[in-house]
Amino acid sequence: MFNRIRISTTLFLILILCGILQIGSNGMSFWAFRDDLQRLNQVEQSNQQRAALAQTRAVMLQASTALNKAGTLTALSYPADDIKTLMTTARASLTQSTTLFKSFMAMTAGNEHVRGLQKETEKSFARWHNDLEHQATWLESNQLSDFLTAPVQGSQNAFDVNFEAWQLEINHVLEAASAQSQRNYQISALVFISMIIVAAIYISSALWWTRKMIVQPLAIIGSHFDSIAAGNLARPIAVYGRNEITAIFASLKTMQQALRGTVSDVRKGSQEMHIGIAEIVAGNNDLSSRTEQQAASLAQTAASMEQLTATVGQNADNARQASELAKNAATTAQAGGVQVSTMTHTMQEIATSSQKIGDIISVIDGIAFQTNILALNAAVEAARAGEQGRGFAVVAGEVRNLASRSAQAAKEIKGLIEESVNRVQQGSKLVNNAAATMIDIVSSVTRVNDIMGEIASASEEQQRGIEQVAQAVSQMDQVTQQNASLVEEAAVATEQLANQADHLSSRVAVFTLEEHEVARHESVQLQIAPVVS
């Protein structure tokens, strides 16, 4: 039944009951304290009223005594100063009595009887006060007979009657307050005893409920935790009820089932780990062997790369020398091309000069022809002249012979010049062909020079590339050696991992997963082959 009630609800009800009991107890205490305070205030007020009324009566008696002394001194004809002093004292006492009585009247009256008594006291005070005022006035005006016949004693007696009534009333109030305080004490004691009994019953019930609903279930939960700590995961956990403890049992059962599944998975995982570790060991051995083979191959490759680097370096040197020779040949060819070009220009100038000489010879030939014609004309004219012209005819014949010889010489020179011009033209053509050939040679040599430069650059780049490849091969060799070291370290780590797996298997072997089961777990011992080094 109690298992179906939530602990929070029960604790809430317990707190509510505690609150009700506390509020009830505090309420009773407050009621008693308030009633006592009211009684105390009433007693205090009664005492203040008694004190104020007693002081008023005492001051009134002082005033009456002073007036009586003043009347006696007046009748005995004492000095006026003494009488005046007594009168001043009497007047001051009367004024003070008025103030004191007003404070008495300002105090709240209780019931109707007290208010009536207060009014009667006020009347008797006013009467007594007026009689004393009259006595003072008569005494100051030397009406001694009126002073002596004033009914002061009667008014004083009336006030004293009211004063005594007030004393009785105040005593009655004090007695009533005392009796009420006694009753309140008895009621408080009864309530206190009742509260103690109820609290004892309540605390006993709460302790029984706490032990039944919290302590005992928590002890059971603790025993389950001890069983789980001891490795017993097969102990059944009963879940009943619907309160928070039930939720803890349900969570504990869920935790037990989860632990059972976890331990089972760990067992399976440790076995699979052993298998995987064995495969890793085999793979490490294989990898170690291949790494060593790769290291040997890389060493051979590094040696070959060194030889290739030396050969390529020699080729690069030869290519640089060939490039220098090609540069020199290109320079020489360019110089020859310049000289051939100069020769071509000179042959062209010679051809031009020969043509000019031919033109001059043609002019000379024309002149000789004209001279021959003129000589012929002169001979004709000399023949006509007869003997006078015979000498002129001889001269004309000589001139004609000279003209003929000049024309013949001019023809021969012209033939020679034409032959020379033809040969010069042929030489110029040959020089032009030689110049074109030299240009082709210079262009070819320049291309050869460029190609040799490119070959030299390529050889240098190839040498640098081969050096980088050799360096990379050397680094690969170092990395391979490091990999071999890592493989050895991995083998050691694998062996340690196998030991840890064995330790893990031995640790989870203490758990009992099923009831009446004795957990036995055979560790798989891995035969780790040594890594080939």
Swiss-Prot record:
Residues 34-188 are periplasmic. Residues 1-6, 210-533 are cytoplasmic. Residues 269-498 form the Methyl-accepting transducer domain. Disulfide bonds: none annotated. It is a multi-pass membrane protein. GO terms for cellular component: plasma membrane. The chain crosses the membrane at residues 7-33, 189-209. Belongs to the methyl-accepting chemotaxis (MCP) protein family. This is Methyl-accepting chemotaxis protein IV. It comes from Escherichia coli (strain K12). The gene is tap.
